[in-house]
Amino acid sequence: MAIDYSLGASIMLQLGPFQFGVTTAAYQSLRRSSEYRWPAQERFNNHAALQYVGPGTESITLSGVVYPEWRGGIHVIDDLRDLASQGLPQLMIDGRGNLLGRWVIERVEEAQSVFADAGVPRKQEFTLQLRRYHGDEDVA
């Protein structure tokens, strides 16, 4: 994977070495989901009691469009696939510099349309499914 992006460019989000932005892959939608675990504890002759046992799964879904002839190039979504295939959690930082923790790429979806010569797509829509990674060192 040869990711070479310019410094000083407007970055929306960075996942490991990959920078989301107008010059690479701009996402139009970011959906974040946070779960909290409340298992039911059965009680005799009474309603079940809920007990908070801690945070659950966090996930992010990014959806966007790449126009390879305009910005980013035809390789951008393949760069995301290469990053996912490394099998390593990636550090995520938002465009304001906030550290969002380590995340793994669970799925990369791509839809190609508006084709040029040799079947090269002029439009690539993508959806990226991420899940927050918590290693053993994160357990308190």
Regions found by a protein language model. Give the residues of each.
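Compositionally biased, intrinsically disordered low-complexity segments enriched in polar/Pro/Gly
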Residues: 1-140
